[in-house]
Swiss-Prot record:
GO terms for molecular function: RNA binding; structural constituent of ribosome. PANTHER family: RIBOSOMAL PROTEIN S9 (PTHR21569), SMALL RIBOSOMAL SUBUNIT PROTEIN US9M (PTHR21569:SF1). This is Small ribosomal subunit protein uS9. Signal peptide: none annotated.
Length: 131
């Protein structure tokens, strides 16, 4: 892929990271050499990926080439959305306020809380017995 007339954005969510390249085209989305429909079986994940493009009404004007690794389905979808948002802002800075208002620009910093010693999970304590 040539560097001319393409824009790039990196997105992260949980333990997933996505590299997104956008260039003028007809709306084809390729994720790890597979189509969006093949890569994400769940409609919810596909919808999350499409959100920034639908917001700025560029769904059928740009082609997306995406590589994503790490994490699960939900984290990868969120990372791709974040990457698409950053690439769109590089493509056209005037899109930033609309994307910001929708909450796509902000990186979701929530992570899995670590398990603590003496507890069953991160916060789940053993049952308390008074007697």
């Amino acid at each position: 892929m040539t560097a001319a007339n393409q824009n790039y954005g990196t997105g992260r969510r949980k333990s997933s990271s996505a590299r997104v390249f956008i260039k003028p085209g007809n709306g084809k989305i390729t994720i790890n050499q597979r189509s969006l429909e093949v890569y994400f079986g769940r409609e919810t994940s596909r919808m999350i990926v499409r959100q920034p493009l639908e917001l700025v009404e560029l769904t059928d004007k740009l082609d997306l080439y995406i590589t994503v690794k790490g994490g699960g389905i939900s984290g990868q979808a969120g990372a791709i959305r974040h990457g698409i948002t950053r690439a769109l802002m590089e493509y056209d800075e005037s899109l930033r306020p609309a994307l910001r208002a929708a909450g796509f620009v902000t990186r979701d910093a929530r992570r899995v809380e670590r398990k603590k010693v003496g507890l069953h999970k991160a916060r789940r304590r053993p049952q308390y017995s008074k007697r």
